[in-house]
Amino acid sequence: YGKFGNEVFRKIETFRCPVIAAVNGFALGGGCELAMSCDIRVAADNAVFGQPEVGLGITPGFGGTQRLARLVGAGIAKEMIYTARNIKAERAAQIGLVNQVVAGADLMETVMKMAKGIAKNAPIAVAYAKKAINEGLQTDIDGGIAIEVDEFSKCFATEDQTYGMTCFLEKVKDKQFSNK
């Protein structure tokens, strides 16, 4: 069960395109772990986060111990997991668990605006940047920089790089990348 859940969440985490979680209401246990598998988390002001598993006699099983510590630091992750206490959206933003908190009525509009902003950029470059961040976090700083340099170099073999640089030099605002 835990292995299958982790496989699903890793697929989300390593999916080529950025994944944005829109959290409205409770994200506890697996729900919190699902949100942490996403690249960006936007929460409604009524959202509640937590890893309550130890109160049930189990540990987080879908990457919660690993992702939470990477997102908020080991000390806060241990406090949240060991106490099994839930936190509100504002606290989640303060500790870095979520990127942004908005009014519930504005949640989907905010997430869609963010997604459209990402989609305006070169898809290949965004995917390479995501890969560099994710893989770089699995190694030391020198290894991470080597990954970044590799992904950066690959961009120069794309039509989007040539087009993007040309648009910059010619001050073109409305770019239409080809994903090539």
What is the predicted role of each segment?
Residues 31-41, 45-46, 88-91, 95-97:
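Active-site-proximal glycine-rich helix-loop-beta segment
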Residues 1-24, 71:
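An acidic, glycine-rich surface segment that forms the CoA-thioester-binding/catalytic face
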Residues 18, 35, 68, 92, ...:
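Terminal peptide-recognition signature
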Residues 40, 79, 83-85, 91, ...:
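Well-ordered beta-strand positions
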Residues 66-75:
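Hydrophobic, secondary-structure "cap" segments at the distal end of domains
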